[in-house]
Regions:
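Conserved catalytic-core segment of nucleotide-activated headgroup transferases in glycan assembly
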Residues: 33-41, 46, 183-261, 334-336, ...
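Membrane-proximal helix-turn-helix segments that form the acceptor-binding/catalytic region
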Residues: 138-155, 495-503, 538-539, 545-562
Length: 597
C-alpha cells in the first residue's frame, strides 16, 4: 500500500461514519471465499432476515471472476466484491460496522469506535500453530493481532481455543467473548438432501466417492510446493492403478500449494470439482483421505469413513510437530499405498464417543444460522468471557537479540527485575525471519511481534513526512527543532504504536535495545511508566548518526528511569547527549570494557 492509499484510508477513518449495516468479510487475505466465511456470507445474502445488511467481500484481482461465479452459483448475488487495497476496499475497511476474518485483519487496519471485529479460525488444529511452530514466527504477529482486535471469537470447540490461546501466547491479552457454536462451514454435512442432489448432478450417484485433501508442507512464507506436488503425482499414479472400477477419487491440493497435478491420463482419479464450495463437495463424498489437516475433524460430523494417508508420518511429526500423535485418532493411519488401498476397501464406519464430544459436539444443521442470528439481533447463544489478568504488564522492546554479552545480560536482567510481572517482549518480526531461534532465549516472556508490512518500519501521512523532513533539516543544520513538527511526528508515533502493539495496554514500557528510530518515537509517547536501558551499540550509533542521537535523547528526556549497562557508558552518554533529570542507575549488565576511553 503506497502513501496515497494509506492517507486515503486514514482520511476515511476520520471523515466517514461507521455504517452499522455494512458487513465486511475477508477470507484468507482475499485469496478465496471459503470455509466458515463462505457459509456466513451465504446465510447473510440468502436469508430475508438480513436484507437490510450490505455485504462486502474482499478478493484479490486475479480471483475476482472465479469468486463472482462461485457466489452466483449459490444465489449470493447481493455480495459486493472489493479488490484488496483498492480505494473501495479502504472505504469499507474504515466504515464497516462488522468485520469478519478467518486468518487476520489487514496489517494497517485500526479499529474505530463502533466497529466490531469477529474472528473465526480455519479449523481444529492437529499440526502445531503460532509460536509452537517457530519456523512460521515471521507471520505470527499479524495473526496474533487479529485475535486481540476481536470482539467475538467463533470457535468450533474448547480444544481449538485452548490450542490457539497457548500457541499464540494470548493468555490475558484477549478481551473477546467466545462462542462455542460449532463451525459454520460444517452445517452442510447435515444436509442429506443437498448431498444426494449434488451426487446426482456430478454424475457419481452410483460411485464410491473418495476425496483426497492433503495439507501443505514447509513454511507459510516458503511452502515446499514443487517437491510435494512431484511426490503426490507419483503416489496418485500408483493409487490409480489399485482402485476398483466403482471408485472415483477427487484430489485437491491445499490453497498454499499453487502447483498443478497432472491427472488427465488417470482412470479413477480426477481433479476436485471446480466452481463449488469445498465443503459442499465434501458432503457428497463417501470417504475422506487426508493427513494432518483440520478437515478430518470437520468431516467427522458425517461419521463416514476417514483414512489418514501420512506417507511422511515420522518426518512430519518430528519436524513440524502435532499436538497429539495422529495414530491416536480413531481412523486408520497408512504410510504407504498398500495399506491405503486396504483401508479404502475395508468396511465403513467408526465409533468414538469421546472424540465426537471433544471435537464436533457443537456442530449441527443450524449452527451457521444460529450463529448469524446471535450476531445480528436474533436469539442469543451462550458466550464465554475471558478472565481479567490483574498482573502488572511490562512491555520490553528487545532489538535484534544478537548472540553475545548484551543479549545474555538482558535475559538475566529481565528475568530478575520483572519476574513477578507479566513480561511481554516485542520486536520487529523481519529481524527474525531466518533467526527465530534467538527468541527461544526468553521462555518466561510472552512474545508480541511487530508485523512489518511490505518492508516498511512505519507508515506516514503526507504532513507527517513533511514534518520528518523538517526535523531532519534542523538536525543537519544544528538548529532547534520546530515544536509543531515534533508534535505532528508524535501523533504518527501514537498511531503506529496502536497498530503495531495490538491496541493492548501495558503498565510499563522498557526499551532494552534496538537501533531503530521508530521504537524510540513510540517510547516517547507511551502514556505510562517508561524505562530506557542504554547499551553500547545504541550510544555508538548516536555518535555516528545525528538523527538517531536526536530521537534517542528525546526518548531519554521523556523517560522515568534510565539504566546504563555500566559506569563507563553512563559517562560517555553525558558527554554525547547531556544530563537527564529522571531516576538513573548503573545496571552492571556486563563489565566496564570501555573504562578509560
Amino acid at each position: 500500500m503506497n502513501d496515497v492509499l494509506y492517507a486515503y484510508y486514514q482520511e476515511c477513518r476520520q471523515t466517514m461514519p461507521v455504517d452499522a449495516t455494512l458487513v465486511f468479510l475477508e477470507s484468507h487475505n482475499g485469496m478465496e471465499l471459503a470455509g466458515n466465511l463462505f457459509a456466513i456470507a451465504r446465510e447473510l445474502t440468502t436469508q430475508p432476515a438480513y436484507q437490510h445488511l450490505r455485504i462486502c467481500v474482499c478478493c484479490l484481482q486475479d480471483h475476482l471472476r472465479s469468486l463472482q461465479a462461485l457466489c452466483a452459483h449459490y444465489g449470493m448475488q447481493r455480495i459486493t466484491f472489493v479488490i484488496r487495497e483498492s480505494r473501495e476496499y479502504l472505504e469499507v475497511l474504515a466504515t464497516a460496522g462488522t468485520l469478519f476474518t478467518d486468518v487476520a485483519f489487514h496489517p494497517l487496519f485500526l479499529k474505530r469506535s463502533g466497529q466490531r471485529c469477529i474472528a473465526t479460525w480455519h479449523g481444529t488444529p492437529l499440526k502445531t500453530l503460532g509460536f509452537d511452530y517457530m519456523a512460521d514466527e515471521y507471520v505470527v504477529g499479524n495473526q496474533k493481532r487479529g485475535f486481540t482486535l476481536a470482539d467475538l471469537l467463533i470457535m468450533p470447540n474448547v480444544y481449538t481455543w485452548e490450542r490457539i490461546e497457548h500457541s499464540y501466547q494470548l493468555e490475558g491479552m484477549v478481551h473477546a467473548r467466545i462462542v462455542y457454536g460449532g463451525s459454520p462451514r460444517n452445517s452442510v454435512f447435515f444436509d442429506e438432501e443437498r448431498r444426494n442432489a449434488l451426487r446426482h448432478s456430478l454424475g457419481v450417484a452410483d460411485k464410491r466417492v473418495i476425496t483426497y485433501l492433503p495439507t501443505w508442507r514447509g513454511k507459510v512464507i516458503d511452502v515446499d510446493a514443487r517437491a510435494q506436488s512431484e511426490q503426490l503425482q507419483d503416489l496418485l499414479e500408483e493409487i490409480d492403478d489399485r482402485l476398483d472400477d466403482d471408485m472415483v477419487l477427487w484430489a485437491k491440493l491445499h490453497r498454499l500449494n499453487h502447483q498443478q497435478l497432472q491427472l488427465g491420463h488417470l482412470r479413477h482419479i480426477v481433479a476436485f470439482p471446480q466452481g463449488l464450495d469445498t465443503y459442499d463437495v465434501l458432503n457428497a463424498a463417501d470417504v475422506l483421505v487426508s493427513d494432518y489437516s483440520s478437515v478430518l475433524f470437520d468431516f467427522a460430523c458425517t461419521r463416514r469413513k476417514i483414512v489418514l494417508f501420512c506417507y511422511d508420518y515420522r518426518q512430519y511429526v518430528r519436524q513440524r510437530g502435532c499436538y497429539f500423535d495422529p495414530a491416536q485418532l480413531p481412523f486408520p493411519l497408512c504410510t504407504d499405498v498398500d495399506s491405503l488401498v486396504d483401508a479404502l476397501r475395508s468396511p465403513d464406519g467408526w465409533e468414538d464417543a469421546a472424540f465426537v464430544q471433544r471435537f464436533v459436539a457443537h456442530d449441527s444443521l443450524h449452527a451457521c444460522r444460529n450463529l448469524c442470528a446471535h450476531i445480528f439481533g436474533g436469539p442469543k447463544l451462550h458466550e464465554v468471557r475471558q478472565p481479567v489478568d490483574p498482573t502488572r504488564r511490562v512491555l520490553c522492546f528487545v532489538g535484534e537479540l544478537n548472540k553475545g554479552k548484551e543479549t545474555d545480560a538482558l535475559f538475566h536482567y529481565l528475568r530478575e527485575t520483572f519476574g513477578a510481572d507479566r513480561c511481554f517482549i516485542t520486536y520487529m518480526n523481519h529481524l527474525f525471519k531466518t533467526h527465530y531461534e534467538r527468541l527461544w532465549q526468553f521462555p518466561f516472556a510472552c512474545q508480541v511481534p511487530m508485523y512489518m508490512y511490505q518492508g516498511y518500519y512505519a507508515h506516514f501521512l503526507p504532513q507527517e513526512r513533511i514534518a520528518l523532513e523538517k526535523i531532519r533539516r534542523s538536525i543537519a543544520e544544528g538548529k532547534e527543532v520546530d515544536a509543531a513538527a515534533e508534535e505532528t511526528l508524535a501523533e504518527q508515533g501514537r498511531r503506529e504504536y496502536r497498530r503495531y502493539l495490538y491496541e493492548n495496554t501495558y503498565d510499563r514500557f522498557v526499551r532494552c535495545g534496538g537501533l531503530d528510530i521508530e521504537s524510540l518515537k513510540w517510547f516517547a509517547v507511551f502514556p505510562k511508566e517508561k524505562w530506557l536501558i542504554l547499551q553500547e551499540n545504541m550510544l555508538e550509533k548516536a555518535g555516528r548518526h545525528p538523527e538517531y542521537a536526536y530521537f534517542l535523547k528525546r526518548a531519554m528526556d521523556r523517560a522515568d528511569r534510565i539504566g546504563y549497562a555500566n559506569e563507563a557508558l553512563a559517562r560517555r552518554s553525558v558527554r554525547l547527549l547531556g544530563s537527564f533529570t529522571c531516576q538513573q542507575q548503573i545496571l552492571s549488565l556486563y563489565p566496564d570494557e570501555t573504562e578509560g576511553m
